[in-house]
């Protein structure tokens, strides 16, 4: 790597995706109040895609202010069912409510990535995927959440598609990496264009 790359996140799945892609990077979580910014954007009428992009930008800019020489990657993901925007569940009861509300319906995940260098946005993208959840009974959801435990609280949809959560779905349209929260292929293309990784 010719330039230091920092992921402005503590997300284990994003770190895994980047490591598996052969990227060398540091992970420094951004110190921002995501929920307050998210709520303000929603009050201002921002779309779920715009919310993801603005949160990713805020994270990257916050870390770039402390490490201006580095190329900082900020990421965020939003989930929406129609006009309802979801947030990470606070507890297992809320996780169950999330899953039951998705039952038999198609929801949308929006994953944003923003690169910032020296306090300036140099690249940004948002990609989306649509996921169809099979019809779920309350009893199944309860058993499922008992099996997966607290991991359900780490995802906006209360599921981890890369694990047992895959059993919740009947169909998926969109990029796998987008679903995991990182538009990896466009990111790798941009890093090659910028001569940050070997192209």
UniProtKB/Swiss-Prot annotation:
Source domain of life: Bacteria
Subcellular location: Cytoplasm
Enzyme Commission number: 3.6.1.9
Pfam families named in the record: Maf
Role played: Nucleoside triphosphate pyrophosphatase. May have a dual role in cell division arrest and in preventing the incorporation of modified nucleotides into cellular nucleic acids.
Homology family: Belongs to the Maf family.
Name under which the protein is recorded: Nucleoside triphosphate pyrophosphatase
Species in which this protein is naturally found: Agrobacterium fabrum (strain C58 / ATCC 33970)
Gene: maf2
């Amino acid at each position: 790597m010719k330039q230091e790359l920092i992921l402005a996140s503590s997300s284990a799945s994003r770190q895994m995706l980047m490591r598996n892609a052969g990227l060398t990077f540091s992970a420094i979580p951004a110190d921002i109040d995501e929920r307050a910014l998210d709520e303000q954007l929603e009050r201002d009428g921002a779309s779920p895609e715009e919310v993801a992009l603005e949160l990713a930008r805020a994270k990257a800019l916050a870390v770039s202010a402390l490490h201006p020489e580095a190329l900082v990657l900020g990421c965020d993901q939003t989930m929406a069912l129609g006009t309802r925007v979801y947030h990470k569940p606070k507890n297992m009861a809320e996780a169950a409510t999330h899953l039951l509300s998705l039952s038999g319906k198609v929801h949308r995940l929006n994953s944003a990535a923003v690169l910032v260098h020296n306090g300036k946005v140099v690249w940004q993208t948002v990609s989306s995927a649509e996921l169809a959840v099979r019809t779920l009974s309350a009893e199944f959801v309860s058993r499922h959440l008992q099996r997966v435990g607290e991991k359900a609280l780490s995802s906006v949809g209360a599921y981890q598609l890369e694990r047992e959560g895959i059993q919740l779905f009947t169909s998926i349209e969109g990029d796998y990496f987008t679903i995991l929260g990182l538009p990896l292929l466009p990111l790798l293309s941009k890093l090659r264009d910028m001569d940050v990784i070997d192209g």
